[in-house]
Amino acid sequence: MQTTMNRIHDPAKAKAYFEDKLAFTTGPVELDRWIKAHEDNLVVVDVREEEDYEKGHVPGAINLPKKQWDNPRGLSRDKTNVVYCYTQQCHLAANACVQFAAKGFPVMELEGGFETWKEYELDIEEGATNRLKKGSPQLAERRY
């Protein structure tokens, strides 16, 4: 049985892990820069519950709580979908990324979730401005 200590002494596995981590995660400052640069190949996805989304979210983010993951309307197969949840520890965003990637959507995870976004004192939008309407098959309109 391989223990945690054995794994950390395997430089090849560590290299592969951190290369993947860098490829599939972004930080709050980098995401904020992308949003402000009017990045048109980006969809920001908040997977928290609707009431938490309405209290505040990353500007331009769509809301896609867990109950809607089977039919992930608003995601794009042609853009990078940056997914976030409450905190780094909740793993909701990571689980969403696994499901969305399995359905063919390119994904990244925002490290630290919305809590870290707030700690950096970055812009926050309130209300349900970008929440998708139930039963609506169209993709969310992205305007940064």
Give the positions of each predicted feature.
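Residue-level "edge-of-site" marker
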Residues: 48, 66, 113, 130
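Short, structured coil segments at secondary-structure junctions
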Residues: 57-59, 103
